[in-house]
């Protein structure tokens, strides 16, 4: 399996066009992005942040992510427009163990850049990276309240494999269902 850090060196940064013609830059998150990433997450609507696994408005959470960057286990891909982060997608995977053939995708996009193809661009890049790494499956966990995200992933070939009722609680303690979606990738 090729090391992710080698793929990154050969692939990024790159430019992509949103559906409205806006040119954005895609690149890996780096240590110098700490403040910009915190500002990005603090600007996300509360209803988006409630569904995330961590409190991304806490500077300590972002600081830990930044100082523990390890592209060979988690690849954080950011979209930048005019020097501001407008999207964050991560591919989580382990090179060892019984899930070494699987990756998990996580995605957020700024509200101003939704319905312009940003999520599709970010996730498609992660799919390409996962394929390059020899991963066989990708998963995403989505609360049903994020129905637009569900349709985005469905459009990109992810299939619902489980709907777990009352399985998670958001940051305010409100119980919610969780949908698990899987996309099969070509086997190497």
Identify what each model region corresponds to.
Residues 107-112, 116, 144-145:
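Active-site acidic-Proline motif in GNAT/NAT acetyltransferases
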Residues 123, 130-142:
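Conserved GNAT acetyl-CoA-binding A-motif
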Residues 1-18:
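Acyl-donor-binding surface of acyltransferase catalytic domains
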Residues 9, 54-101, 106-110, 123, ...:
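Acetyl-CoA-dependent GNAT
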Residues 23-36:
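A short beta-loop-alpha structural element at the N-terminal edge
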């Amino acid at each position: 399996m090729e090391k992710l850090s080698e793929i990154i060196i050969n692939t990024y940064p790159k430019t992509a066009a949103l559906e409205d013609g806006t040119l954005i830059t895609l690149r890996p998150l780096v240590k110098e992005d700490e403040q910009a990433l915190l500002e990005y997450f603090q600007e996300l609507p509360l209803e988006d942040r409630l569904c995330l696994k961590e409190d991304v408005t806490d500077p300590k959470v972002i600081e830990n992510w930044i100082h523990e960057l390890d592209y060979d286990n988690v690849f954080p891909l950011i979209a930048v427009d005019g020097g501001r982060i407008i999207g964050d997608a991560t591919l989580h995977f382990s090179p060892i163990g019984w899930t070494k053939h699987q990756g998990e995708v996580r995605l957020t996009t700024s509200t101003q850049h939704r319905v312009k193809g940003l999520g599709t661009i970010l996730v498609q890049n992660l799919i390409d990276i996962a394929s390059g790494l020899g991963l066989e499956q990708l998963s995403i966990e989505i609360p049903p309240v994020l129905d637009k995200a569900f349709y985005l992933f469905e459009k990109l070939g992810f299939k619902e494999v489980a709907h777990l009722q009352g399985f998670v609680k958001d940051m305010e303690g409100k119980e919610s269902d969780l949908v698990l979606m899987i996309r099969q990738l070509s086997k190497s």
